[in-house]
Amino acid sequence: MSNDVEKRINDDLQAFSQDTVTFMQRRPPKTDAAGNPTTGATLFSQEAIDSKAFIAARDSQRMHILQGEGGETRAAIASNDRAENLVDTFKYNKLADIESAGLMQATLAESPWSDDYWAIYKGILGARYADPSFPASADWKANHDYIRSNPASAILTSGSASRINKLSPAEKYDALVGDANESLTKAGWAEGKSYYDMHGEVESWMGICHGWAPGAYMLGRPLKAVTVKTPNNVPITFYPSDIKALASLLWANVAPATRFIGGRCNDKEPATDSATGRTTSSQCFDTNPGTWHLAVVNQIGVSKRSMVLDVTYDYEVWNQPTYAYSYRYFDPQTRKYKSKLDEAMISMASFTADKFRAFRSPNTKFVVGIQMTVSYVVETRPSHREEDNPSHDAIQQATYYYDLELDADKKIIGGEWYQNLHPDFLWTPAKSARAQTAYDAQATGSWAQGSPLPQAWRTAAQSASKSQSAPLAAIVEHLIKFSRAGSTPVPAPTPAPTPVPTPTPTPTPIPTPVPTPTPTPTPRPTPTPTPAPTPAPAPRPMTWWERLLARLLGR
């Protein structure tokens, strides 16, 4: 380890010792994959940040009610906060065993792919991102009016390959499946219209990052552009960004049940301990440092698979797929870096400098200090790049300080955060999970790249667009397969180039945000049609809030 890293750890811990309350409120600085300081990406307007409206936005997405609001504030691992409930394979619960296995650091073989969050105010997948005339305005209506004035139907009959290939991902999909009603495209614009009609605006943060985050590692990376034909034999090119967009929408709207740990917290000013600044609200303390440490090591290090990271009070981290981690020890008594575990481990009897003694689990016998740096993928702007590989991903890093509580057997049983802006909600679909619509079973027959879609696929796809606002899983998966044919995945560079975070471009000022864009809806189950040539009329599509709620509740 370099002397610079050791100095940084010691300096940070000295700052914690001198002014614990201030340090507890510090936002973890962000760096790129090479460790260079960078500005964290955010989807929120400055007004939403200043008013802390982003906290309500996160809470609305989680949609999971914890058991009561009171109870213990001790930092023992709670029932809704167990790493075993999240990870694919839970193997290690002792620091010595983790170190012996060489898992104090780990990096996935390939990073989850970066993509846009496909903002609702730009029409979600209806945004013509490659069209230089598309306004990409903060005003939903300005964007929608442009699409209405320049209809896809006219472009498709123009004979201009350049114009056709600049259509939005949803417009290309509607053309591919022969949907003259443009059901998928209209569904995206309809999402924004309801908010616009109610509030006169659509919040900049509203999008489908909750679909991109799992889709980025549950589905393979599109490696190259794919040209396919419409039923009228019109060639259309789907660029990697277009295919990623469809994958993100699929996972946003029809994803299976999700495994998660942590809970909801919508308190803009949670109660804190006056002496330390530590959050004392039991719901807003999630996730426990012990759970966090065990989840990261056992999921990324052991299971070799990503998971999604969220931090309630850090507007720069929202639904980010994790990619790598590394951690180091420090002595919590002296608050100095230590290279060896036994030097960093202190008994509770000797831990006289413990600032969090009032919150310790009664089963704690030893405490070890940890500094962990976690790498995660952030959003990028879509492009007409012909090929994609991990070198185009945007990777950022955040560093967290905490200590771990060990029992008499030196098993990790809890811990204390040294920062309130810490990971508090982790989630992932099961490894074998598949996002698919209720109509995928009707897509019978096979589809070859050089041929138009079979009629059964077209019928099923149009039904899925109308009733579930989602692309057919079979089509998305085939587009990915076509894009990967004959290609060898490129390993991620080390280090990766400087990431390009994507705060929402807003040519016009974003109006003052409404902290609660819409009342919490009543969850509605995904409609399941009767497999038949002509499905019965489906109920209205659920909003993205309802779909997310249904996923978290396993419905």
What would you call each of these model-derived segments?
Residues W292-V296, T534, R551-R555:
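Generic low-polarity alpha-helical segments
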Residues S2-T444, A448-P454, R458-S463, S467, ...:
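Active-site-adjacent structural elements in enzyme catalytic domains
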